[in-house]
Amino acid sequence: MDSTVTLFQTRQPESIKLYIETSGSMNGFFRANKPTNFKKTVWSAFSGMAHKTDGKVYPMSNGGDIDTPVILGDFRRKMNAGQFVSNFSTHIPAMLLNIIQNIDTTKNEVAVLVSDMKYSPMGESAATELLQYQEQIRNIIGYNPNVSLSFVCATSEYLNKDGSMAEEKSPYIFLIMGNSENVAALRNDIARWCEATDSYVESGDMAMEYHTPSYEIREVKNGLLSPTYPRNLITTYDREVSDTCSFIIRINMNGFPWTAVDSEIIKDALTAKSVYGSSVDVELLTEQDHLVDDHAYQRNFERRSYADYLIKLYNVAMDDEVIEWNFTNQPIDGRYFVDFNNMITVTDENDLSGLFSFNKFLDGVVNARLNTSDKEPVRILVSSYQ
């Protein structure tokens, strides 16, 4: 039943390529012989992903070129010794294009770039160049429809040349690129690594194909859930017992950013209607055991996240009724915490507390492709027959 519906579930990538920007604007994260949250978090994430990589990290500099790769073990030593301090500048569109052209999404390969994502044109033409930058990003993403993106924002100390503190919480980005299912899985992992080092700020998805989230039907009242079709069929509904048949649709939220698991954001994300005219009510349940986002379920490195919607079917005139429901990502898209919004709206490229021009990057991706969910509804047959 309902073979036309594609269910979205996170899936770990088969392989990962690791990239890191080494440019002048990143120097404060790389200063020698000083422990920073950047070094701790990046190494935690890179070493955690190491078993899926080719054992190398690919630095990027000189306008956006992919430099000679560094063996992962040597990368940690060089990072701690300040050997990635650089006088080069990078060009984000070139950097992005070079990375995307080296991703084989047919083999579930994902790329991860660590960067401050600052694009800083100079002089009188700066405003015009920023708009052109947004269009460049749009074109790159538009011409590569197989690639979805997610970001995780973290903060770290940013150091002056003498090792003194220039900014206590300077933001940077893990940018994840690949298939939607792979990107979502790795976004969860990287966000958890950042949370573990107390550096997590925000995460978000771009150009994602969410389809229909994986779900299950639970707690059927006045009916029985079919063991053969547990996603689509409820039998033995008895109007003489009660006018109402109710059940819970549990939406798997693992595929969505952490910010999404909020009652104010997703209260109207699920909509339902009947095919033959019966009444249908939908309610998001907000009690602790019904709206859950556990980033380390049972102390394992695993996210467990779901939202329960109570469905009530009543005023049923026939022996059978079909409920059609959809879950939309639209209330979720672009909903960020205030701290992150403040970071991406800074107007001074030298403001180390912000992500100068990252809002232009986000707008460029959105202008190319929106996050989408399937329009085809899920159908649940509620029958009075066994």
Show the residue positions of the predicted features.
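Bacterial Sec-dependent signal peptides at the C-terminal "C-region" and cleavage site
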Residues: 1-9
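Von Willebrand factor
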Residues: 9-115, 119-120, 148-152, 155
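Extracytoplasmic/secreted cell-surface and envelope-processing proteins
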Residues: 26-31, 65-71, 119-130, 158-163, ...
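Well-ordered, non-membrane alpha-helical segments in soluble/globular domains
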Residues: 32-45, 82-98, 124-141
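VWA/integrin I-like adhesion module and closely mimicked acidic/polar interface patches used
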Residues: 118-177
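Acidic, serine/threonine- and glycine-rich low-complexity intrinsically disordered segments
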Residues: 148, 156, 160-290
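Extended non-globular C-terminal regions
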Residues: 224-386
